[in-house]
């Protein structure tokens, strides 16, 4: 406990800085900032005034490390950096920290359009966004391709190809790679696409309509039809925007709290367009003020890949505006104003974001409480020492002993944790021996990169024979984790599941019980992930091995088929005429492909 470090705390400087609470094996438990380090650390000595969570943390602290900074701004930035890199156990945990997806147009002589997430490279790309979902980006790029015939290929492919790719054949690219369009004309199309992304749709539409009418008056009806289609696709892009608008680039933030959870929502405007409201959730908030939570969030949010606009709006309850402004200036290298709403429009937008935060938080808590109720009941049924926070579910998949794969699905008190999922390509040749496959998967799981993360409960898709396998692996690796094997009934029907545990008789649960339905959902998710992972592996191998075996199919035709159809499944569903549309594929070759693909899929499925 910290009392034994009383002398160290008393000798701490009365200056700005950051402190780290460090536990066993040099594990960082908490990172905090302070305007006065000595005063802040002294607060931890008032043990009776601390929350239970902080008391538990302090019982694990072995030492305190101090970093002095020049001012509060540097302390805020350093704290955010350390929290992001160290992920301390007792700090606020932000969920959904993904970068916003953007659309990029490269600064190449013949620019490429693409979807992008990550840190910005301003010397190489123009960025447009942010968008609230990858689906919105994909649809917008597709519409821009159809409207302006822009390339999406890599620069390497662009510089090396000798003939147009399938994008040209399906009228989504003008093939600048092989001079099917002049550089000036292509750059004009790029300019129109950029203007569209900047919100100048009306100007671009008028240009396209003028050209369409000109072509029509000159009786060049084929070209006029092309420009007519461009206008149609341009209008589709316009339809995707939502109702709210704001004159300047701005982000509106709100924060709503209940219990130990906070929801921070952001509503973004770029080029007068609304890009939607996105909720983020922060855990472990009970000991922090709204100012602390939001200031840390904003620095992390804009210190990743999200470029701050010229102004952001925060609730009136946030008072540290100047500190946030100075921190964001250091992050963005440009002035960013942090404002309170001053007029009805701004207040309405902040209220809209607040309402979204409130709704998202309420739904999150409802889901959490429902899930917690199931987990409490599960812990009683399976005699677990505590309510599980991390459940790992394991399943295997193979076809006649080939293409063997094992998967791990993870669930917590908030639902499935998809970023924690893992798949294991079975290295040994076990010819479909499920016991040996499970042994390899569990051995690799508990001796690999994430061996330090110990779950509270394991659920194995298997029967009584798996119990000894799991027990042996855990004993060899000195892992103490409760587990159960879940097997379907004699007819492999859901609802007749039997459970097998070490030292207990087999048992079943009522088909309509909440825990039974929950366990079925865990098992089904593992099965889905196993099948999906296996299918991807199978299709990849199928592409390489099976398409290559078809006489007349080389690498170029194989790539053209996959570029056009996207998957083997889509090829099998295609018509003869559709396959003939691929450059270089005759009617006879198309018939061979269809026959071969459908036969192989029949065998595989």
UniProtKB/Swiss-Prot annotation:
- Which Gene Ontology CC terms are recorded? cytoplasm; excinuclease repair complex
Q: Which UniProt keywords apply?
A: Cytoplasm, DNA damage, DNA excision, DNA repair, Excision nuclease, SOS response
Q: One Pfam family this chain carries? A: UvrC_RNaseH
GO terms classed as biological process = nucleotide-excision repair; SOS response
User: Known Gene3D superfamilies for this protein?
Assistant: 5' to 3' exonuclease, C-terminal subdomain, GIY-YIG endonuclease, UvrC, RNAse H endonuclease domain
GO terms (molecular function) for this protein are: DNA binding; excinuclease ABC activity
Q: Give residue ranges for domain GIY-YIG.
A: 14-92
- Where found? Cytoplasm
Q: Where is the UVR domain?
A: 202-237
Q: Does the keyword Acyltransferase apply?
A: no
The similarity comment for this entry is: Belongs to the UvrC family.
* Quaternary state and interactors: Interacts with UvrB in an incision complex.
Chain's role: The UvrABC repair system catalyzes the recognition and processing of DNA lesions. UvrC both incises the 5' and 3' sides of the lesion. The N-terminal half is responsible for the 3' incision and the C-terminal half is responsible for the 5' incision.
Matches recorded under PANTHER family: UVRABC SYSTEM PROTEIN C, UVRC/OXIDOREDUCTASE
The name of this protein is UvrABC system protein C
């Amino acid at each position: 406990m910290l009392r034994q470090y009383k002398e160290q705390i008393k000798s701490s400087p009365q200056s700005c800085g950051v402190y780290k609470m460090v536990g066993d094996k040099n594990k960082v438990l908490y990172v905090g900032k302070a305007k006065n380090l000595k005063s802040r650390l002294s607060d931890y000595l008032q043990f009776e005034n601390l929350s239970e969570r902080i008391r538990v943390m302090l019982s694990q602290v072995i030492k305190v490390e101090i970093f002095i900074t020049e001012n509060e701004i540097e302390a805020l930035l350093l704290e955010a950096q350390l929290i992001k890199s160290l992920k301390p156990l007792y700090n606020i945990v932000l969920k959904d920290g993904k970068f916003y997806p953007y659309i990029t147009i490269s600064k190449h002589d013949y620019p490429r359009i693409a979807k992008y997430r990550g840190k910005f490279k301003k010397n190489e790309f123009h960025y447009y966004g942010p968008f609230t979902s990858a689906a919105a980006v994909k649809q917008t790029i597709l519409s821009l391709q159809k409207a302006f015939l822009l390339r999406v290929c890599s620069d390497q492919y662009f510089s090396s190809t000798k003939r147009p790719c399938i994008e040209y054949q399906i009228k989504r690219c003008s093939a600048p790679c092989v001079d099917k369009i002049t550089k000036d004309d292509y750059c004009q199309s790029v300019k129109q696409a950029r203007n569209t992304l900047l919100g100048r749709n009306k100007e671009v539409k008028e240009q396209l309509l003028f050209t369409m009418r000109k072509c029509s008056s000159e009786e060049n009806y084929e070209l006029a039809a092309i420009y007519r289609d461009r206008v149609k696709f341009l209008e589709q892009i316009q339809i995707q925007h939502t109702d709210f608008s704001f004159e300047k680039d701005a982000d509106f933030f709100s924060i709503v709290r209940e219990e130990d959870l906070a929801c921070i929502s952001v509503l973004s405007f770029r080029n007068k367009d609304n890009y939607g409201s996105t909720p983020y959730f922060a855990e472990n908030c009970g000991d922090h003020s709204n100012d602390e939570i939001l200031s840390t969030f904003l620095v992390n949010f804009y210190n990743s890949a999200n470029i701050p606009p010229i102004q952001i709006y925060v609730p009136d309850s946030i008072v540290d505006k100047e500190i946030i402004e100075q921190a964001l200036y250091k992050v963005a290298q440009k002035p960013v104003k942090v404002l309170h709403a001053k007029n009805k429009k701004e207040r309405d937008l902040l209220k809209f974001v607040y309402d979204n935060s409130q709704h998202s938080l309420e739904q999150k808590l409802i889901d959490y409480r429902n899930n917690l109720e199931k987990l409490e009941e599960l812990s009683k049924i399976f005699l677990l020492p505590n309510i599980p926070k991390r459940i790992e579910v394991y399943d295997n998949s193979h076809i006649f002993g080939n293409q063997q794969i094992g998967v791990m699905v993870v669930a917590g008190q908030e639902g499935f944790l998809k970023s924690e999922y893992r798949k294991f390509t079975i290295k040994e040749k076990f010819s479909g021996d499920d016991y040996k496959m499970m042994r390899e998967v569990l051995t690799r799981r508990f001796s690999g990169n994430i061996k330090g993360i110990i779950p509270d409960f394991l659920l194995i898709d298997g029967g009584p024979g798996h119990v000894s396998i799991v027990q042996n692996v855990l004993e060899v690796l000195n892992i103490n984790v409760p587990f159960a094997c879940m097997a379907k009934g004699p007819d492999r029907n859901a609802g007749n599941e039997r459970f097998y545990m070490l030292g207990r008789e087999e048992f079943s649960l009522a088909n309509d019980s909440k825990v039974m339905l929950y366990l079925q959902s865990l098992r089904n998710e593992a099965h889905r992930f196993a099948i999906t992972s296996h299918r991807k592996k199978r299709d990849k191998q199928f592409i390489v091995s099976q398409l290559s075996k078809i006489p007349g199919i080389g690498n170029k035709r194989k790539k053209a088929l996959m570029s056009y159809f996207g998957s083997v499944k889509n090829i099998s569903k295609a018509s003869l005429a559709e396959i003939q549309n691929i450059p270089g594929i005759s009617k006879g070759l198309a018939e061979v492909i269809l026959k071969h693909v459908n036969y192989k899929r029949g065998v595989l499925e």
